[in-house]
Amino acid sequence: MIKIKKRKILLLPGDGIGPEVIQEVKKVILWLNSNKSLDFEIDEDLAGGCSYDKHGTPITDEVFYKALESEFVMLGAVGGPKWDNLEFSKKPERALLKLRKELKLFANLRPAICFEQLVDASTLKPEIVSGLDIMIVRELTGGIYFGEPRGIKPIENGERKGINTHSYTTSEIVRVAKVAFDLARKRSNRVTSCEKSNVMEAGQLWKEEVQELHDKEYKDVELSHMLADNCAMQLLKNPKQFDVIVTDNLFGDMLSDQASMLTGSLGLLPSASLGAKNKDGEMRAMYEPIHGSAPDIAGKEIANPIASILSFAMALRYSLDLDSEADALEKAVQDVLNDGLRTKDILSQGKKEVSTSAMGDAIISKLQ
């Protein structure tokens, strides 16, 4: 293989089990450097509660600038009960929100794939989820999480009022819809756009702009519109009707979590947050497992690293266009599951329980 240019990767292990699962990603990166003539330069730093403990802030300016200079960021997990009582601006999760906003990561990709080896782990019947492969594309930097005005203010009679603003512009909708349509062209060529156009003006605009974009540039892709509450119901009733779902920040947050539980384990599911491409065709991006920091099992060597490793596979695919390497890594995960190896969260009768590091080593062994 031809040696490619040096690529800077910033690892932010974060809190709880984050350092343990990111360590397994680091092992994969070093293996690729040694065996596939890839040239990744790894930097590692603090974000989340661990950063607050050391620096008094969930992410320092220095770390943020490192993120700006990196090809992409690999995040472990942030947060935990230890920091629940901090003021809002100091909470570990603010590091994640700042990275998303300032790196302009507008599209969150959340695959919900049911591994055949684990189909019995789903709460739904096997025939409902077997073969499930959904990609949820969530708009990430607009909507009610970032809209202004916002806040809590006193009003008359000693009451208080909480305010959040839900708004979207044409450009915010169109750019994330383009991501969804482009992904669909590489999958089963179907997009379902979800909103609440029956009661929300922002939802009406969303539906109109997605339809107009489709009619202008993506007529070859099958497009349907669905109210978000109906989508939540359909994900339980008939999830395999979906290919790519595109939706706003709030509904995407909820629907992607719901879809993830169809698969049986959060420990298997990756995510990607993508930004716009510059004139050289490069884009900023951040990759992370969808599971939380799980402080109750931190340090016990029982965390599942598969979601983090598959997140790195997404980085190979979407940030570096290394599809063959991404395919090989995803196949290695499948092969290990076929061998019956399981971390504690996905362990079932007749399978062999392995530690976090042993699972990482087994996956690397399949890359040989």
UniProtKB/Swiss-Prot annotation:
The keyword Metal-binding applies. Its EC number is 1.1.1.85. Its cofactor is Mg(2+); Mn(2+). The record marks 145, 196 as: Important for catalysis. Binds 1 Mg(2+) or Mn(2+) ion per subunit. Mg(2+) binds at residues 229, 253, 257. GO terms for cellular component: cytosol. NAD(+) binds at residues 80-93, 292-304. Pathway: Amino-acid biosynthesis; L-leucine biosynthesis; L-leucine from 3-methyl-2-oxobutanoate: step 3/4. Substrate binds at residues 100, 110, 138, 229. One of its GO terms (biological process) is L-leucine biosynthetic process. It is found in: Cytoplasm. HAMAP family: LeuB_type1. PANTHER family: 3-ISOPROPYLMALATE DEHYDROGENASE. Catalyzes the oxidation of 3-carboxy-2-hydroxy-4-methylpentanoate (3-isopropylmalate) to 3-carboxy-4-methyl-2-oxopentanoate. The product decarboxylates to 4-methyl-2 oxopentanoate. This is 3-isopropylmalate dehydrogenase. It comes from Pelagibacter ubique (strain HTCC1062).
